[in-house]
Amino acid sequence: YVKDTANGFMTIADCDAAIGQELNIATGVEHSIGDLANELIAQINPNAKIVCEAERLRPEKSEVNRLLGDSTKLRELTGWAPQYTFEQGLAATIEFLRGNLDQYKVGQYIL
């Protein structure tokens, strides 16, 4: 979630021991695109169904199948930890977008 990420960057900036270190800002919890889609459906419209359109599918082998970040080193250096769950971050993002729809081209699929 963006607030956790921003807080992580600020925490790193305030930590002299972090200078020159490679650090990950991450939850340490893996979520698939399916998890994301299902949680969005649960929060926005529980009656929605996922429909795949073949022309929008990416070619096989064009994607990384799994990503999982480990922020152990950051936590040990600074005490940083994420403050938002996956579900809380999505809920806050949905609330923000609902309040700012006029800023987006809703209903247009742009590549």
Regions found by a protein language model. Give the residues of each.
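C-terminal substrate-binding subdomain of Rossmann-fold SDR/epimerase-dehydratase oxidoreductases
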Residues: 1-111
